[in-house]
Swiss-Prot record:
The gene is rlmE. It is found in: Cytoplasm. This is Ribosomal RNA large subunit methyltransferase E. S-adenosyl-L-methionine binds at G67, W69, D87, D103, D128. Its main location: cytoplasm.
Amino acid sequence: MATRITNKGLSKSSKAWMKEHLDDHYVQLAQKEGYRARAAYKLLEINEKTNLIKKGMTVVDLGSAPGSWSQVAGRLVGDEGILIASDILPMDALENVTFIQGDFREEAVFDRLMSEVGDRQVDVVLSDMAPNTSGHTAVDQPRMIYLCELAVDFALRVLPKGGSLVMKVFQGEGEQQLRQQLQSQFSKVRTIKPAASRPRSKEVFWVATK
């Protein structure tokens, strides 16, 4: 049975967040259109601008839970495509999606992903990974940069020339150094801030083509 969310017992700041969340255009749209989270519209806009994900492609979705990016990517690649998703959190099953639950920072999980990819040519790697934020930038930012570095390492291993990485990044310390590294490893890197990203959010998305 679903549990109804109420304002009872919430702090003032939590009540404000809840009101903003429930009033959010993209939250309402996601509920109406059957997406698991508003984040779906970030990937939809990114793909609208880049046309990266197409029918029949093989896509890997890192940090996939609750599954909205996998929903979008799955519809874009269609029945002929292949979608492999992974997250430290559980994710309800999606048709034609192979899900690997585990911590991407652990070598065993990385190896399971590589094994699932096998000899396939991966066309696009998606990374919406982010750490559990503490509210302290000095702690959160290095954790985010580390996850990005892991995503880049994975992408470099599985993407052929012409393949692409779409990766969430937090603006802040270490970001420019990471971008310089990316520019030396990929032929093209562009930044997209989707309309569905909240204006105050530090997140941007880099689209890197090998």
